[in-house]
Amino acid sequence: MGAAAKLAFAVFLISCSSGAILGRSETQECLFFNANWERDRTNQTGVEPCYGDKDKRRHCFATWKNISGSIEIVKQGCWLDDINCYDRTDCIEKKDSPEVYFCCCEGNMCNEKFSYFPEMEVTQPTSNPVTPKPPYYNILLYSLVPLMLIAGIVICAFWVYRHHMMAYPPVLVPTQDPGPPPPSPLLGLKPLQLLEVKARGRFGCVWKAQLLNEYVAVKIFPIQDKQSWQNEYEVYSLPGMKHENILQFIGAEKRGTSVDVDLWLITAFHEKGSLSDFLKANVVSWNELCHIAETMARGLAYLHEDIPGLKDGHKPAISHRDIKSKNVLLKNNLTACIADFGLALKFEAGKSGGDTHGQVGTRRYMAPEVLEGAINFQRDAFLRIDMYAMGLVLWELASRCTAADGPVDEYMLPFEEEIGQHPSLEDMQEVVVHKKKRPVLRDYWQKHAGMAMLCETIEECWDHDAEARLSAGCLGERITQMQRLTNIITTEDIVTVVTMVTNVDFPPKESSL
């Protein structure tokens, strides 16, 4: 078995090396074209020099559309190292009837001519047809023989391995193929190119990527976290999930082979990132705080709402179960949108809510009943757990607000001052459940009329009694009312307005869930 594996590896290295030497073509420059040159502020056409790391290969690419037989070029230019472009001297699209045609190749100006040549069909040349070149029979022969030999060795080795493993139970949990990827608007749209890692989390990492002329976010899950990927896809695919304050879903895909699979979730990209990242680097004004808090509450209220009779079906109530500032993203105008539904529960009539295991989420944001393991497994109980965490996120906003007449604290996570950055479950139980502590509301916040009302609202969100917490809809109304009242306060009538504020009828304190 060991000798066979070594032989296979040696032959594989030889064949790969010979193939690379024979087929590799250095790309220094490519034909450049941009149909949207005025909007992108680039040249319309020209020659583009290709730059990149010395150990990376460079390619040319072309994208175009076929509109009723008329060829419209979208873009041409340089393309970064892509295994799908290796050793292609001609720029040919082989996919069957894509919406956007895409091809890539190696060699200077190789994208000057491009064509559409679907497999099993007759070539449909574009306005710039490629002149076919004579086949390289010798290269094919030298490449195929070692490949066939490798395939035979691998098949034999695999058969011996399986025969040997049948007698022994597996020690590790086997990697499972998630099956065919779900229907996705991205299947057939190229190119999608990963650019840089923006964040890492419990279930994978988030990349900034480029899809044709726009940036998108790609969340990549390892196969071990298939359940989280599947759950997030299912939640995004529910009827009525398109909302201004819920992260826009674009598609889901499976990438890689059956042995090495990554699961991709593609969403809108927001340059400002998460609320947590934003607050680390910025303070907020009172109006900015109100806008972020109100749009955040709107998103959660919509998520919690059960909405029958939509055009595309019935939207069930959904509990997020991992509300935190890292899972709230900010658009350029500071409008908030809720993200990350890997742990979410949907409450559909006549169906199980799925895995309702109580102690999930991020420890420092866990409600007292979650830390105690004393959850009532009903819909309203899960929605109230979200509201406790929302109270902590509002505290994070308040701690970085400049409205009050006092110093603005350095950004800290909830309970970081009391427990530190890496609390254990026992630490959280001691502070939250037994001592019933909450993050500190500064005394000088009470001197600002709006901040004083916000502090009262925060306390009603994180109330130890779950049934006394505000609902998300009530929270949104409170914040709207706070902003309206504080906006009319002036230097001349501040005493009058403060008197009015004390007589305002707030929405009921009890949860309306």
Curated annotation (Swiss-Prot):
Catalytic reaction equation(s): L-threonyl-[receptor-protein] + ATP = O-phospho-L-threonyl-[receptor-protein] + ADP + H(+); L-seryl-[receptor-protein] + ATP = O-phospho-L-seryl-[receptor-protein] + ADP + H(+)
Residues in the signal sequence: 1-19
Record topology, Cytoplasmic segments: 162-513
Domain Protein kinase intervals: 192-485
InterPro entries tied to this protein: Activin_recp (IPR000472), Kinase-like_dom_sf (IPR011009), Prot_kinase_dom (IPR000719), Ser/Thr_kinase_AS (IPR008271), Snake_toxin-like_sf (IPR045860), TGFB_receptor (IPR000333)
Membrane topology: Single-pass type I membrane protein
Enzyme class (EC, first level): transferase
Compartments, as annotated in UniProt: Cell membrane
Entry-listed glycosylation sites: 43, 66
PROSITE patterns, alphabetized: PROTEIN_KINASE_DOM (PS50011), PROTEIN_KINASE_ST (PS00108)
Catalytic residue positions: 322 (proton acceptor)
Residues noted as binding ATP in the record, renumbered to the chain: 198-206, 219
Main location: membrane
UniProt record, GO biological process: activin receptor signaling pathway; adrenal gland development; anterior/posterior pattern specification; autophagy; BMP signaling pathway; cellular response to BMP stimulus; cellular response to growth factor stimulus; cellular response to oxygen-glucose deprivation
Topological domain ranges for the Extracellular compartment: 20-135
A Pfam family: Pkinase
Reported function: On ligand binding, forms a receptor complex consisting of two type II and two type I transmembrane serine/threonine kinases. Type II receptors phosphorylate and activate type I receptors which autophosphorylate, then bind and activate SMAD transcriptional regulators. Receptor for activin A, activin B and inhibin A. Mediates induction of adipogenesis by GDF6.
Subunit field text: Part of a complex consisting of MAGI2/ARIP1, ACVR2A, ACVR1B and SMAD3. Interacts with MAGI2/ARIP1. Interacts with type I receptor ACVR1. Interacts with BMP7. Interacts with TSC22D1/TSC-22. Interacts with activin A/INHBA.
Protein name as catalogued: Activin receptor type-2A
Name of the gene: Acvr2a
